[in-house]
């Protein structure tokens, strides 16, 4: 068990459970809010085939998460979609989480890669849909699945 003091002076206890994953304790409750998220480009265009766009996409998602207190456990940017596991604040619902990540990352991408406007003149980089589920105790299996995405897509 580890004890850390957070920025507001409250005592935050971190407890190791299930495969070494750290869970947070706030007062009388213990838990985490790990989410496996998949978001795809609009029309599944392979926009991240370009190494430049792929790098900017990674940086834009990292910045969006940092600004909103969302911790990225793993992030894999594929040619037409992104897989990630994030640990978000426990009060944040899935729809808000996706809105923050897709909205700010899209806004950043259109400013640093101006040529994206040729493909997406309406300013929608991401598809309207998404996949988001709680990871729970399957963290190691989900992490390995995301880690092996290049190999998974190479065999298809």
Where do the protein language model's features map onto the residues?
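Charge-rich, low-complexity N-terminal segments
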Residues: 1-156
């Amino acid at each position: 068990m580890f004890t850390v003091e957070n920025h507001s002076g409250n005592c935050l206890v971190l407890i190791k459970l299930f495969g070494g994953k750290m869970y947070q304790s706030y007062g009388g409750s213990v838990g985490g809010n790990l989410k496996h998220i998949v978001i795809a480009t609009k029309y599944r265009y392979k926009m991240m085939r370009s190494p430049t766009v792929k790098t900017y996409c990674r940086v834009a998602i990292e910045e969006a998460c940092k600004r909103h207190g969302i911790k990225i456990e793993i992030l894999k940017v594929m040619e037409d979609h992104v897989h990630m596991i994030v640990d978000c604040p426990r009060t944040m619902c899935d729809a808000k989480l996706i809105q923050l990540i897709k909205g700010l990352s899209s806004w950043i991408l259109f400013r640093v890669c101006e040529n994206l406007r040729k493909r997406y003149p309406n300013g929608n980089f991401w598809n309207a849909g998404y996949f988001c589920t709680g990871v729970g105790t399957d963290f190691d299996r989900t992490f390995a699945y995301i880690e092996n995405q290049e190999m998974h897509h190479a065999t298809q």
